[in-house]
């Protein structure tokens, strides 16, 4: 029998799963259809398509983990189950983080303006090497997830301790104690791509500030398209920073949940908050991307007309 908190958790996480799959699936479908029609795909759409596929995987793993915690709270007392879940989560998490970083760096290189030789070289090369960059993201994520699996597999101490525990809650606390260091370490490693995105964000803001100063010197009274592009990219990157911060805090909460008396409630709350990152940022991308937004509006308009008829 589920508690009221468990019922609320299942309802919320199911809703997030549906919205996440629909939102990210919509982006992938639109870009795929456009790719088929035009026989080519832009760099930003190519990065976005890979990103939403990674996010669908991340949302799925997080939802499975959340449901398993509710249905089978002693899952963390079983080495194999924990290793499998954590390995898949690590892979999807890192792949999502690095591809998002690629998207943010791409926005910066394509929108910002600078005369620095390194910037100009990267701006010229980005379209040519994007496939290799994304392949590198996949390789890094796979390597980190394999290392995570090996690290967790090498530590069997919790089996010996858990065998002497009868209470599931005690077993949960004991089984998670050996994983404190690796879990924390792998969470901290995710800061690396975030820092790269943060640097790109501040450099883009600096570029907008310099561009605005130039516009004021030669003001014509009309809206500047370059400024609008700058602002739209900054909004996208700001939403990423906000949702990632929420995601990171939620991950830390779940990592340290074994220290709390209401550990299960802490994990459930952390799961719900964490899924907002791959869900919310993708919805923001739809709103701020002209092509995705216009197609979505047309779909709603056609649906309304069909309902009237």
Swiss-Prot record:
It comes from Pan paniscus. The chain crosses the membrane at residues 8-28, 51-71, 83-103, 132-152, 185-205, 240-260, 267-287. One of its GO terms (cellular component) is plasma membrane. InterPro entries: GPCR_Rhodpsn_7TM (IPR017452), TAS2R (IPR007960). It comes from the Eukaryota. The keyword Nucleus does not apply. One of its GO terms (molecular function) is G protein-coupled receptor activity. Most taste cells may be activated by a limited number of bitter compounds; individual taste cells can discriminate among bitter stimuli. Residues 29-50, 104-131, 206-239, 288-309 are cytoplasmic. It is found in: Membrane. The lineage of its organism: Eukaryota, Metazoa, Chordata, Craniata, Vertebrata. Keywords: G-protein coupled receptor, Glycoprotein, Membrane, Receptor, Sensory transduction, Taste, Transducer, Transmembrane, Transmembrane helix. Glycans are attached at residue 167. This is Taste receptor type 2 member 8. Belongs to the G-protein coupled receptor T2R family. Pfam families: TAS2R. Its main location: membrane. It is a multi-pass membrane protein.
